[in-house]
Amino acid sequence: MEKNINTVKATPLGGKVWFNAIFFGLIGQIAWIVENMYFATFAQDVFANSGRSDMSYWVTTLMVILSAVAATATTIFAGAWSDRAGKRKPFIAFGYIFWGITIMLFALLPMKVSSGSVFMVAVLIILFDCIMTFAGSTSNDAAFNAWVADNTDDTNRGKLNGILSILPVIAVVIVFVGLGGLYNSANESNALFFVVIGLIPLVSGIIALFLIKDAKGLSAGTAGSRDTLGDTFYGFRRETIRSNKMMYVTLIAACLIGTAQQTFYSYLINFLIITLGLGDGFVIPMAVIILGSAVVTGIFGFMYDKYGRRRFYFPVLLMTVIGILSFYCIQYTEGTARSLLLYVGGIVMMGGLLSLLAALNANFQDSIPSGSEGRVQGVRMCFTVLIPMIIGPIISLILGLDAMGINGSDFVPPFSLYAAAAIVASIAVIPVAVIRRRAAR
């Protein structure tokens, strides 16, 4: 249950915790941005260049779904393993090193293939993506998220989660503005881009060996327990659900918001480039939207701890829905009105999404049973990654293929993606209302 933060002095986190959380959190988000956006864009470009635009939707959908399955399964086992070991550091450090190596695998793939090689390349793209996800989920989803929960409490999670929720958009700026010039869909190969990106988590993993420290008092919470399978699936037990109902209500809300985001997220770059016709000029509006939403999210993060999260749930959810709908409405505007809706609507959309997810993540961490920070990361992944990354892309696939029937063989992400996303996000009002009512008690 959320406490009245006004009457509780926030526990200081310390400079080392802040630095490690932000630095390794950012590195993880840079790697995830490459997977969530560039791997999808890469696959879409490869098949568009090869004259198989229809494969763009199918491969993107399979990539997202199978990587979500890999991420969830990995986190379930790795989270429980880190709890039993009583350590997070080796999972983070060695996981980041392996993560970097797996990103470099994409350097082996060309940007255009012959008709006889299309299927093989599709399989390799999906396989490499799943291998990369295994590394990332072990180090980031399981170990790093458990490390954050270990080092925070309900008086300072709002600030830290607010900052952490900004990191994905900062990572987008770093990748697209700082490194995006290395990637070009017209290149024969984008090997240099994937090698450079892969070096970032690889080197960071080596640094983690010297900087990351496990929380004081962290011990092998289930050492001596022989029920390995039971510990692994702790978050899925009936008794765990009954004893921690609000944790699961929070996850349902996060699941709906995540599904809304996944409905359009993998196609966002090509939506700006192709659908809106911005071409290479998409970088400027994306940078403005990212920076603007980062400011919005940061402000909400500090306000959560100062005033309590309860009063912000509904306003931030409304922001999210309105922002998503604004992108759908862009098709009905021109000139200055179109640009204004793109920039303002984008900031409201991404700012709302990130701020709401930050609040829900903090509420989830508040609800974790003591000593089970690693074991519940798997069930968190099930609700925030697996389900959203199955349902969202399927919605995209249906709408995308339907649009191709209208536009011919061209690959043009449709505006209808945002209408569907807004509908899904609106349903989150039900679990959010329950969370808000419980927080008032």
Explain the meaning of each model-derived region:
Residues 73-86, 296-309:
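Helix-to-loop junctions at the C-terminal end of transmembrane segments
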Residues 72, 158-180, 381-393:
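Glycine-rich segments within core transmembrane alpha-helices of 12-TM secondary carriers
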Residues 2-14, 216-251:
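Juxtamembrane intracellular "pre-TM" segments in multi-pass secondary transporters
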Residues 96-118, 319-335:
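C-terminal ends and interior cores of transmembrane alpha-helices
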Residues 311-357:
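C-terminal transmembrane helical hairpin of 12-TM major facilitator-type secondary transporters
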Residues 84-97, 306-318:
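Cytoplasmic membrane-interface "Motif A"-like loop-to-helix N-cap segments
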Residues 88, 181-199, 397-424:
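A membrane-interface helix-boundary motif in multi-pass transporters
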Residues 3-68, 246-253, 257-276:
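Helix-loop boundary and gating motifs at the non-cytosolic
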